[in-house]
Amino acid sequence: MEFNNFVFPAPNFEYHLLEILKEKMIFIPSKDNHYIPCLFLHNEKEISKNFIIFFHGNAEDMFYSNEMARALQEITGMNVIIVEYPGYSIYKGEANSTKILENTTIVYDFIKTQFNLEDNNMFVFGRSIGTSPAIYLASVRKPNALFVVSSFTSIRAVAGNLVGPLKYLLKQRFTSEEYIKNVTCPIFFVHGKSDPLIPYTETISLTKICKSKYELLTPSHMTHNDFDLYEDIIEPIQKFNENNCTIDNGKINIDDIKNDIDKLHKMPQEIEFYIRDLKDKVK
């Protein structure tokens, strides 16, 4: 098996979250004539020239991860693009590592081209299962910085913590220990020492492999899902940026790109149909 639903379960679809956040949704065209659903969080009056491509954790989707991403957007002042995974929320399909990794570069390149940006304007964030696509993306592109929270060396290592010998049934995908060797931008690692799901030693192992400049924060009280969002993650990221990155403070006038954003907001018919099916299933 490539993905195990017990190890990486997508949450049940919550229609009310879609209704609350539907104005933040954008749909990025993929290579197979389908669309990648994302949330686009930004200042309402003017848009920063800096974008954080955000990859959420397991057992959550782009809607559930909105709170963390919104805090990141507000404190850093950067825009945040939350990328959805196949099989999660309104993205039809099955969780597939090959597709997820392919989508990372599609989203990165699209945002960079759409808003006429440089690599210096691009940042990458990943948490839990999302750290591997984040590290992969940073290994094949040149973002300004990479932020990873609760990372792991490989999918097999994570599965082993939950299902023991069954880990050998998993195909070796999401091999962060290989990707990180090719990352050249500064990296900020956060991993709680009390994490029972992914031991913080997984992140320690990555720091020993990576060749780029990095900082490591390991709060003793922090578990996988229990932490102070601002003190443990958001504020340290902002401090890391200030100390390690050259930030472009330029702005994009939202009126100048309103038509382009409106086009991205338009929901493709295939996703409309899929949402109807999801609603019928939860009735």
Predicted regions and their residues:
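Catalytic histidine neighborhood in serine/cysteine hydrolases
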Residues: 204-226
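Short beta-strand/loop motif that positions the catalytic acidic residue
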Residues: 182-184, 188-191, 195
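The serine-hydrolase catalytic nucleophile loop
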Residues: 58-72
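Conserved alpha/beta-hydrolase
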Residues: 73-92
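Hydrolase active-site cap/lid region
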Residues: 131-185, 218, 226-231
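Short alpha-helix in the alpha/beta-hydrolase fold that links the catalytic acid
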Residues: 67-68, 176, 185, 199-208
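An N-terminal hydrophobic leader/cap segment in hydrolases
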Residues: 1-29, 39, 277
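Alpha/beta-hydrolase active-site loop
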Residues: 94-115, 178
